[in-house]
Amino acid sequence: MTPLDTSAAAIFAANRAQGAVKFDVRLQDGMTRRGRVQESGSLRVRFPSPEAEGLSAVFINTAGGIAGGDRFDTDIAAGEGTRLTLTTAAAEKLYRAAGAPAQIRIALAAAANAHLAWLPQETILFDQARVARSIDIDLAETASLLLCEIVVFGRAAMGERMLSGEFVDRWRLRRGGRLVFAETVRLDGDIGATLAHRAVANGAAAIGTALIVPGDEALVQRIRDSAPSFSGEVGISAWNGFAMARFCAQDAARLRTDMMAVLGCASGTALPRLWLS
């Protein structure tokens, strides 16, 4: 590598966005209160007024989106008996990357009898975006979880589709110290052609996943009974002490509607207000 190459790499690295948020919540006088909050770079968190059913936190990416080489880290811990709902101020946009992929790391933990809800708005992948995301969840045996992620392959309203790029999504769920769910989704190269396969996404422009802990067949049946018809394709099942719903749709709005129906039935509480704005 020539000195010029080294200098170019250093300039590229220096211009990449980085952000990190780390905080915990604890029970105080019967209310969920935030503990120490650490923020750095272009990732911020804000806490609306505490509500009777728990504490809400909203993440804000002041960079306006994520590009190749960016890195964002989130570490959240819900203390014993707390109730915490996490969401984002807007959909996250992943832009075209000419070099290294963006790195997103999310670590969530919930202690005994805590309830943690991770409910971000959509992640939108632009054509030729590259991103590697990891979501690690560590639950106590008696903790509960409501988690969803929606991924949109391009902005359909603008006539855009993600045709190529790289999307790696690694999920790990531990409950009571045991690994109960592990999955890695990898899409690269001609992503448009891959999504067009009937056995993959049947041409869907948006996909989603919801995890519900604890979850069983009774919960699955209750969701099916309460929402007998969906706008897109939805599959729901339960095993190993949790329930999972998978979503595919031709547009993000329909998928969001289906996701809200499932989450509303599973939680029995209102979704974040930002989802309704």
Swiss-Prot record:
Record keyword Chaperone present: yes
Listed Pfam families: UreD (PF01774)
Any single GO CC term annotated in Swiss-Prot or TrEMBL for this entry: cytoplasm
GO molecular function terms noted in the UniProt entry: nickel cation binding
Top-level lineage group: Bacteria
InterPro entries documented for this protein: UreD
Keywords: Chaperone, Cytoplasm, Nickel insertion
Localisation: Cytoplasm
UniProt KW Coiled coil keyword: no
Family: Belongs to the UreD family.
Subunit structure: UreD, UreF and UreG form a complex that acts as a GTP-hydrolysis-dependent molecular chaperone, activating the urease apoprotein by helping to assemble the nickel containing metallocenter of UreC. The UreE protein probably delivers the nickel.
Function: Required for maturation of urease via the functional incorporation of the urease nickel metallocenter.
Name under which the protein is recorded: Urease accessory protein UreD
Classification of source organism: Bacteria, Pseudomonadati, Pseudomonadota, Alphaproteobacteria, Hyphomicrobiales
